[in-house]
Amino acid sequence: MDPFSQLSQLQHNLQAMTKTVAGLENDMLEVLKENTELKVENQLLREKISKLDANKEPAENKSQAGLKSLRNIYDSGYHICNMYYGSHRESGEDCMFCLDILDNFVNHGQKSRG
């Protein structure tokens, strides 16, 4: 096989591999998206179960539990804001919308105590 044919064959193989990698990347993104949605849904269902089990808790404990749940979701790397709820945050990246929600939640709880 001459060098040109070898180069042509190599280029064809590279294009096929590029398509395969792109397909795998798309599949991985879909799996990650579904995983995120399931984690958020799971967390929401756990919160609903907690609410059903603990209807007699004082309001302050409920709000603290809600804040803790939101904080856990956010700390796990997911958005809790209306704009991006449930989507994955980049590592080390903070979202001002999510942080605003957490800040308002904390400040609202402090005002109701005072």
UniProtKB/Swiss-Prot annotation:
The keyword Glycoprotein does not apply. It comes from Lactobacillus johnsonii (strain CNCM I-12250 / La1 / NCC 533). Keywords: Cytoplasm, DNA replication, DNA replication inhibitor, Metal-binding, Zinc. The keyword NADP does not apply. Its cofactor is Zn(2+). It is found in: Cytoplasm, Nucleoid. This is Replication initiation control protein YabA. Belongs to the YabA family.
